[in-house]
Amino acid sequence: MGTVAFAAMGVASESAQAQSFAFGAGATFPQIVYRQLMDCMYDQAQGSSGKPGPLAKAANCGSFNTSGFHGMILYAPTGSGNGKSVLRANDKTLIGTPSSSAPPYTSANIGVSATADYDGVQFIGSDDVVNEADMTAWNTGGTTSPQSKFGNLIQIPAVIGAVAFGFNGKDGTGATLNILPATPTGGSSGLNLSRNAVCGIASGHITKWNNPILTALNGGALGTGNITFVHRTDGSGTTFLLTNALVEQCRYEFGPNNETDSTVVSYAFPWTDRAQSCSTPLVPRGANQVNWPDQFATNQCGTANANSGGGTFANASGSGALVSLVTTTNGAIGYASGDFWLPVKAGGLKTANIQSQWDITGATGKFQPPTFAGAQKALATAIPQFDATSRANPLTWSLQGVAPNPVVAGAYPIAGFSWIEMYQCYQTHSNTNNAYTWFKTWIDFVYGTGATGIFNENGFAQVPAVWQNEIYALFNDPANGPQGSGCSGKVGAY
C-alpha cells in the first residue's frame, strides 16, 4: 500500500524538490529507527556543537537521501507526554530537552542548532494512545482550542515494537548472575521470567535475585541481593505500553508478599495513573506516568504510595537515561524498546524472555524473547473495524490499536504501536516551505517496502497492510483527512 502511495505522490514530490524541512518531537521509543528512516529518505542530520552527532546509516538503506530530494526532517525525542503538549499548542518552545544520548535532533548546516530554531512543529510521536482527556484538551477553549485553529487531531500507527526488559547482568551484590537456561532463537540471554515473576517484580513483591520463584524458573539460584526495578519518570509512551499490558496480565497473579513474608498477596499492578483527578477513585490503568513509590511519596489525593513488599525502585527520564542507570546499577532491570539492548544494540545489555498468554494456557514451557517478529504477531491480534465516521475519531484508533494480552503462538506479550499524531489543517509557511508535503512523502516511505529492512534491523516491525489501508482511507477523505494547503475557517498549523 505504502509503495503504491509513494509512487502516486509524483506531483507533490516533484514540488518538494525545492528542498524543504519538517519538524517533530515526542516518543523516545522509536527515536533511533525514526532517525535512520529520515536520514535514508532525505539528507542526514548532522547535529551541532554540544549536541549528538550524525547517526550511522541503516544497513538496509542504500544511501542517505535515497529520494534525491535533499531537505531534512528533524525529530526531538522528549517523551510522548511532552510531545502531546507540544502538538496541542503548536509551540516549539514547549519541546523538552532530549537525553544526551539521543540521536541528532539538530543540524547546524541548515541553521538549526537547538529546538528553538525549528521552523514550527508539524507532528509528534507517541506510544501513549490518544485518550479522552487528550480529546477534551483538543476540543475545549472555543475559538482558541486546537480544534478551532488546526482542525481534527489525527492519530496513525507508525511502527510496531516490543517493550523489552534489559538487565544489568550482575546481582544486587555485584556478582555475575548465574543464568543456566539456553538462549532462545532471537534472544540475547537465557533469563526466563514467568508472568507471575514479571508481575511480582513490578509490584515490588519479588525483591531478591534468589527468590524461589526465579530459582525454579531458571534451574538454580540466579544470585543474591536486591532486584532494582528501573522505571521512567517522564510522561512516557513506553510506560503506557508496559502498564497497559501489566494491568491486564497481572490481574489474577498472586504470590508471597516477599522473601521473608509468606503471606499470599495480589501481584496485580498496584501503581495508579498520575493524571487521574483526585475526585475520581484512583485505579491502576495503562498510563504514561504512574505513582511509582520511589518517585511519589503520595498520590495526587495525598495517600501514601504503600510499597508493602519492600521492592527497590529507581528512576530516570528518557529511554537512554534509563538504560544508562540499569547499566551502572548492580541488580537492576528496566524497560525500553528493543533497539536499546542486545542483540540490536552492539555492546548493549541482555534482555529477559517472558511468558505469553499462549504459553501459559497451552503449558508450552516456552518464554518469548523481545523480537520484532514476536511484536508483529502480538499486534496481528489488533484488527481495525472502521466506517467513515469512526475512522475520523482518534479514540476509535486508540481502542482498536492496542493488544494488552495477545493470545497467539509466538507473540511477545508486551508490545504495541508507536503512533504519529498530526494536524488536519496545515498552512504553507510565508517562506514557501510546505512542511506537510515533506512529512507526508516521508510517511509514504515509512509504509513502503523500502523501509521494512530498516525497521527489522532496529528490532521493530512495519505497520501491517490492514492498518495501512485505513490510514490511506483517512488521508484520502476530503472531509476528515489532512489538508496540506489549509482548511476553510482554520488558521492551520505550522
Regions found by a protein language model. Name each.
Residues 18-494:
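Flexible loop/hinge segments at secondary-structure junctions
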Residues 1-17:
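Gram-negative bacterial Sec-dependent N-terminal signal peptides
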